Amino acid sequence: MPEITVRAKSKTYPVYINEFALTDVKEQWTKSLAKYSHVFVLTDEHVANLHKAKLDAVLADLPVVTYYVAPNGEEAKTFRVYEDVMTKMIETGLDRKAVLIAFGGGVIGDLGGFVAATYMRGIPFYQVPTTVLAHDSAVGGKVAINHPLGKNMIGNFYQPEAVIYDTQFFATLPEREMRSGFAEMIKHALISDHALLTALMDTFTEPKDFYTKDLTPFLQRGIEIKANIVAQDETEQGVRAYLNFGHTFGHALEAYGNFGKWLHGEAITYGMIYALTMSETVYGLDFDLAKFTTWLERLGYNTTFDVTVPFSNILDNMRHDKKTTFNEISMVLLEDIGKPVIFKAEDELIFDTYKSVMRNGGDLF
């Protein structure tokens, strides 16, 4: 089975990925889990309804397994749900020898990792992602919940024991969710690998390709790209910030939509278009943006804004971005495909780029 090793400064761990990963690692994994006093599974309503039986079959021989089913979507990454999970764990009697399994998409991975990092000052956890989007979030140890004023503002760096990535779960993903996750695959290509971007554009030309073409080699490459960056900079003091390409504007948009109007990948797609546009202005990026957006549209992405989003709201939200320091907004831009840089953007440039994107897309004024 394909295995990728993540070598972070704090921990080295494997990522198992294929269509039957859960079955393939069952014997080895359950032996490891049997060493813990209690297995606590954190999932959401959607995943529990569709896939709980699959995980139950793997965990069947373990004596003590408890589930917590969180609400779907970004609602799960709130103080209220975080506190409720903690209460459940305390009432259940989980001790420091317990282990947590985050079974779901990126939201559950973020929440589960943050719970594991903070319960009794830290217990081990495993990532069992069920979405395309989670190929990015499940690897690298960023765990967090949201604050009403910003996405992922309360968090930590906390690595899992392993990532078990069973791609059979993709079959039940709605097209919109597939698209959202695919956006992070595009991001990895833009910041690191022109050949990967070309392969993505050549292989995936219409929405049904998400289900009929093999995503696994592209996911593996994306995970390898991220693992290499995390090995250099686990806690985002330097190059790891490159993984935030498209996220400064994208997170600002998500916050404006109360973390529900747009899926993460949808907001990041807008953010990448915004960052590419600014890259053309600042660095003269030689990139056929029109061809790129046409390709996105063929895949079903909306590349124009069809709602009114005041610039003042976006700017305020960008100021709350974690990369903002001394009130200076940091953007991840591209000198070329595969050559990201950190750029301190002045308000005037942020506004001019905003006007340019809106003029090329929808009218937001």
Swiss-Prot record:
GO cellular component: cytoplasm
One Gene Ontology MF term: metal ion binding
Catalytic activity: 7-phospho-2-dehydro-3-deoxy-D-arabino-heptonate = 3-dehydroquinate + phosphate
Binding site for Zn(2+): E184, H247, H264
EC number of this enzyme: 4.2.3.4
Metabolic or biological pathway: Metabolic intermediate biosynthesis; chorismate biosynthesis; chorismate from D-erythrose 4-phosphate and phosphoenolpyruvate: step 2/7
InterPro entries (UniProt xref): Dehydroquinate_synthase, DHQ_synth_AroB, DHQ_synth_fam, DHQS/DOIS_N, DHQS_C
Binding site for NAD(+): G106, V107, I108, G109, D110, T130, T131, K142, K151, F169, F170, A171, T172
Domain of life the protein comes from: Bacteria
Keyword entries, A-Z: Amino-acid biosynthesis, Aromatic amino acid biosynthesis, Cobalt, Cytoplasm, Lyase, Metal-binding, NAD, Nucleotide-binding, Zinc
Enzyme class label: lyase
UniProt cofactor note: Binds 1 divalent metal cation per subunit. Can use either Co(2+) or Zn(2+).
UniProt subcellular location: Cytoplasm
Cofactor(s) listed: NAD(+); Co(2+); Zn(2+)
GO biological process: amino acid biosynthetic process; aromatic amino acid family biosynthetic process; chorismate biosynthetic process
Family per record: Belongs to the sugar phosphate cyclases superfamily. Dehydroquinate synthase family.
Function: Catalyzes the conversion of 3-deoxy-D-arabino-heptulosonate 7-phosphate (DAHP) to dehydroquinate (DHQ).
Descriptive protein name: 3-dehydroquinate synthase
Native source organism of the sequence: Listeria innocua serovar 6a (strain ATCC BAA-680 / CLIP 11262)
Upper classification of the organism: Bacteria, Bacillati, Bacillota, Bacilli, Bacillales
